[in-house]
Swiss-Prot record:
This is Protein enhancer of rudimentary. Coiled coil: none annotated. The modification Phosphoserine is found at S24. Keywords: Cell cycle, Phosphoprotein, Pyrimidine biosynthesis. Signal peptide: none annotated. InterPro entries: EHR_sf, ERH.
Length: 104
C-alpha cells in the first residue's frame, strides 16, 4: 500500500484543479471510476442505473485537461509522478481483476 495523491484538472481554468488522496493505488483507481460515475449521474439524473464500458471511461479520462498521480516511494521517501496512460493501465488491471474475481 502506497499513499497516492490524485491530481485532476477537468477544465481549462486553473480554478478547476483539485486533488484527492488515497491509501493505495487501487483505492485511487476506484476513485477515478467514482469520479466518472458521478459525472454520468450528473449528465443523466433520471437514469436509475449507470452502466459504462472501459472505453467510455478512458474517453472521459482523455477529455480531462490533466489527470495524474503522485505515488509514495518508500525506498526514497519521495512521491513519483504518473500520467494518464499509467492511470488507464492501472484501471484496466483493476477492472480485469474484478471481472475475473470469484466474488464479482
Amino acid at each position: 500500500m502506497s499513499h497516492t495523491i490524485l491530481l485532476v484538472q477537468p477544465g481549462a481554468r486553473p480554478e478547476t484543479r483539485t486533488y484527492c488522496d488515497y491509501e493505495s493505488v487501487n483505492e485511487c483507481m476506484e476513485g477515478v471510476c467514482k469520479i466518472y460515475e458521478e459525472h454520468l449521474k450528473r449528465r443523466n439524473p433520471n437514469t436509475p442505473t449507470i452502466t459504462y464500458d472501459i472505453s467510455q471511461l478512458f474517453d472521459f479520462i482523455d477529455t480531462l485537461i490533466d489527470i495524474s498521480c503522485l505515488v509514495y516511494q518508500k525506498s526514497t521517501n519521495t512521491y513519483a509522478p504518473y500520467n494518464k496512460d499509467w492511470i488507464k493501465e492501472k484501471i484496466y488491471v483493476l477492472l480485469r481483476q474484478a471481472a475475473f474475481s470469484p466474488n464479482a
